[in-house]
Amino acid sequence: MATQGQVITCKAAVAYEPNKPLVIEDVQVAPPQAGEVRIKILYTALCHTDAYTWSGKDPEGLFPCILGHEAAGIVESVGEGVTEVQAGDHVIPCYQAECRECKFCKSGKTNLCGKVRSATGVGIMMNDRKSRFSVNGKPIYHFMGTSTFSQYTVVHDVSVAKIDPTAPLDKVCLLGCGVPTGLGAVWNTAKVEPGSNVAIFGLGTVGLAVAEGAKTAGASRIIGIDIDSKKYETAKKFGVNEFVNPKDHDKPIQEVIVDLTDGGVDYSFECIGNVSVMRAALECCHKGWGTSVIVGVAASGQEISTRPFQLVTGRVWKGTAFGGFKSRTQVPWLVEKYMNKEIKVDEYITHNLTLGEINKAFDLLHEGTCLRCVLDTSK
């Protein structure tokens, strides 16, 4: 492309301070160095993780930064040594890297990758420990190794999944975070079996993806738990077949679920990020075999607790990141499943706005009616 090797000036939404409106700026995006890829972002969605960092509660939150980690675009150029993608490829940037070489990747036990974490966790690139973004000569931090609230971004090549060029980018951008996180929590982390009873705490995008995953896994009872009863109607479309509002009961929700399920559920999923709910999710599991998966991200410094007897008597407490999916290997597979109509994606998109309307999009995110808002970055 004509821009290869040059600094690109483009529009991006910059977070200068926690909880202050994002500012649409002309940002300079440097060319990719060795092992890096510059991507033209076409569509990006908002996730509660973006809002979490923007709130100032994230211990790794750095300002000023360009947020965003759920997106899709086209490779503009690549740095030296990059062989798996080239200019023109359709891609999804992945906050969960996959180098296939580090001890994590080689272990066969996890989808975590250690290659670039020391850089992405502090908002910079590995090569020179610097940012590729600047405004008027002042550096702007990266976010989660993706920074997709920008018309162009630079990412490590181990964080890029090449996808089917016929897939609609305004839809499959969701496969960069929330939907795989929920599906994978069921398929990879919990390994839910047919006939299982499942409880899902929190019916946002991730919770609904858990429901979809549980339904396709053959779960029989899929119990949705949320303090907003209006969410049940939508949740039914994703597989939830029972609903409980904790506000309707005068005893702890774990006791309600245990009574409802003859001793507890086989699997529970906490999709909120609330440590007291995490405890309830564990304690509503059946003695002897119940497994609870923590999916939601709690605020910095918060701790989980329960009585050890809960674990001694056979319950298992697990966590998951990106649903246990290997990003570069399995995101393309998820795109194919979507193209074959084997998983939902469109149904999670409730709003479509432009990059210039990003602050409105964050307002919508905090309203119960918004699941995913997709932004067209060209406007």
Swiss-Prot record:
Tissue: Ubiquitous.
Binding site for an alcohol: T49, H69
Annotated keywords: Acetylation, Cytoplasm, Metal-binding, NAD, Oxidoreductase, Zinc
EC class (word): oxidoreductase
EC annotation from Swiss-Prot or TrEMBL: 1.1.1.1, 1.1.1.-, 1.1.1.284
Gene giving rise to this polypeptide: ADH2
Keyword Protein transport recorded: no
One Pfam family per UniProt: ADH_N
Residue positions binding Zn(2+) 1: C47, H69, E70, C177
Assembly description: Homodimer.
Principal location class: cytoplasm
Name used for this protein in its record: Alcohol dehydrogenase class-3
GO BP terms in the entry: formaldehyde catabolic process
Species per Swiss-Prot/TrEMBL record: Arabidopsis thaliana (Mouse-ear cress)
Binding-site residues for NAD(+), renumbered to this chain: 48, 202-207, 226, 231, 272, 295-297, 320-322, 372
Induction: Down-regulated by wounding and activated by salicylic acid (SA).
Residue numbers of N-acetylalanine PTMs: A2
Disulfide cysteine pairs (residue numbers): none
Gene3D superfamilies: Medium-chain alcohol dehydrogenases, catalytic domain, NAD(P)-binding Rossmann-like Domain
Keyword check for DNA damage: no
Function: Alcohol dehydrogenase catalyzing the reduction of nitrosoglutathione. Can also use long-chain alcohols including cinnamyl alcohol and geraniol, and, to a lower extent, octanol. Plays a central role in formaldehyde detoxification. Not able to use ethanol (EtOH) as substrate.
Regulation: Repressed by thiol-modifying agents N-ethylmaleimide (NEM) and 5,5-dithio-bis-(2-nitrobenzoic acid) (DTNB), as well as by methyl methanethiosulfonate (MMTS) in a dose-dependent manner. Inhibited by hydrogen peroxide H(2)O(2).
Lineage: Eukaryota, Viridiplantae, Streptophyta, Embryophyta, Tracheophyta
Residue sites binding Zn(2+) 2 per the record: C99, C102, C105, C113
PROSITE patterns: ADH_ZINC
Family: Belongs to the zinc-containing alcohol dehydrogenase family. Class-III subfamily.
Subcellular location: Cytoplasm
Cofactor remark: Binds 2 Zn(2+) ions per subunit.
